[in-house]
Amino acid sequence: STQGVSSAASDVYKRQEFPAGTVPNEHNINGAEYPRIGEDRRVHFRVFAPNAKKVEISFRGEMTKEADGYWSLVSEKPEVVGFHYYQIIVDGVSTADPNGKPFFGMGKWVSGIEIPEKGVDYYSIKNVPHGLISQSWYYSDIRKEWRRCLVYTPAEYDKNPSKKYPVLYLQHGMGENETSWANQGKMNFIMDNLIAEGKAKPMIVVMDNGNIEVFKNKPGESLADARAKFGAQFPAILIHEIIPHIESNFRTLTDRDNRAMAGLSWGGLLTFNTTLNNPDKFAYIGGFSGAGNIDLKNIDTTYNGIFKDRKAFNDNIHVFFLGIGSEEHPERTKKLSDGLKAAGINNIYYESPGT
């Protein structure tokens, strides 16, 4: 427990009636009834903290204290479908929910809720052949530290010992780490389902830590300068350490036509900074809600002039994907996509409805 927060009191759960039309959050630990997700996509939170003076749920507001020592809160409006982080804040102290499984986000271990999307199951576990996610450790001379990447191999990998596979290097968002695409993003289930349906080639997917540490600008240093250093080492680590490590330890196709990179949010920026500066290494590029600094006004010189020869770029980059959710203020990404197309640079724009 933390300042009186407890996940116990299962006897209380047995006596109470749960709000109609709600089910336990899928990320609750076994036996935990709260948080609960309503059919209206609102979330019902309940926390046992009898000695607390104030309890809040991050991003959602203050809870109401009940007579039995529990505090409760219901989302003010329906939540957007998908995964969302939250913390319990008890008298000013933030903590993960003891009723939930931990997820690394916001630069620390926190809790998560899942708002299911009706009629959609591409990210659900199904009765199809399942791939394996393994840990692979290597020493980084650049960072002077041991590092870990998570590696997805398709279900057929061990059954075809002579077959080599294309590789996708997949990066997380700001404040997350190498576990995030597997834990929060369910990438293994997505890949399993796509491969089983014949919508994706069997491939290896590598997830590494983008060095997105929490940072503060040093005395006399501007926030912009500090931000410019944020994750700046990662492209070199990927090119000179991660890719050689993967190609030495897994059966990979090592030419650029069989190598892709994509990333979420800040991972999208790392993707652009890596791939657009190393076009000899990658033929597929993806930004998912991706941050970016592609300068449309100076398109011929940005990223060392990679876009200047339009035909060469379009011939060499087989897919340049820009995706974002309709609830994420997609205007900037749409403007980037339209600007690139107007300049003669092929790209695929996708706006995910309701996310």
Regions found by a protein language model. Give the residues of each.
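Single conserved hydrophobic/aromatic residue that forms the stacking wall/gate
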Residues: 1-9, 13
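Non-catalytic cap/lid and distal C-terminal segments of serine-dependent acyl enzymes
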Residues: 18-26, 31-56, 60, 65-355
